[in-house]
Amino acid sequence: MENIIRKPYLDKIEQALGKDVIIVLVGQRRIGKSYLLRQLKDEKAKDSSNNIIFVDKEKKEFDDIRNYRDLNAFIDEHRVEGKKNYILVDEIQDIMEFERTVRSYREEPDTEIVITGS
């Protein structure tokens, strides 16, 4: 099966990056939010000056991230000083009090936040 690059949507996300905003992709289930987030992750990973922090709450490897404290610990463990840190969280609504994390890391320099939710 061939993957479809959703360039117009990626371009819109790119335009919003660097503008001190939190990018939120919302919509009904199964419309491609997760796929778009993975495309963004793959695109940003091509640049070695970027650090990607990716959480996919639909994957069992992230089951231990249940609340904002768990998410903070995961992010802190994976952040890299001196690089542009991209915090990408898929299905963020599954993390209790996630808003606290989002507000906190929004203030961090060299940090971009893109999240999805249904």
Describe every region a protein language model picked out:
Residues M1-S118:
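Phosphate-binding site recognition
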